[in-house]
Amino acid sequence: MAQQSLIYSFVARGTVILVEFTDFKGNFTSIAAQCLQKLPSSNNKFTYNCDGHTFNYLVEDGFTYCVVAVDSAGRQIPMSFLERVKEDFNKRYGGGKAATAQANSLNKEFGSKLKEHMQYCMDHPDEISKLAKVKAQVSEVKGVMMENIEKVLDRGEKIELLVDKTENLRSQAQDFRTTGTQMRRKMWLQNMKIKLIVLAIIIALILIIVLSVCHGFKC
């Protein structure tokens, strides 16, 4: 990945940009701000393409986290960067200063943090990609679990059915254990019978050999 794949970032409350950082000059800042004005307010992730660059947004709880990246950076690295920024920002300002801060008033405090996160993500692309894949898998599992729970809670009979099913499974498991014990006992008895029969045959063969060699009992 190119060393300068992430070129601009900001954090906004609504449409008010509280902190931003870039080492470059260009109209990407105004384009990013224009996109911010048109973003849906619902929690989500958005990516827009423009002239070889991507404008990536993470919207959560009234705050928007943005990063402009070169197209070759893909989507995973920019989105992982936004997640890191969101976590750091919430730790520092969650439920406090960020709720009333003025435009660009957090530049001195948090601008350097944006730069640090940018540099880290650009310097450790492999690590970021691995973490992103793990988080994606976890999110997918959480999504499936939540969906299933919501489906169950929609109808009371489904919950009852699950309880009934569980009871049936318990009873089936008990029956299986009982049957298994009986089967093991039966197999043990069969094995013992076979062993006794084989032993009797061996003894009989030995007796026959002894009798034939000794001409009866005249040894």
From Swiss-Prot:
Any one Gene Ontology BP term: protein transport
Disulfide bonds: none
Designated name of the protein: Vesicle-associated membrane protein 721
GO cellular component: cell plate; early endosome membrane; endosome; plasma membrane; plasmodesma
Family as reported in the entry's similarity comment: Belongs to the synaptobrevin family.
Membrane topology value: Single-pass type IV membrane protein
Ranges of residues in domain v-SNARE coiled-coil homology: 130-190
Gene: VAMP721
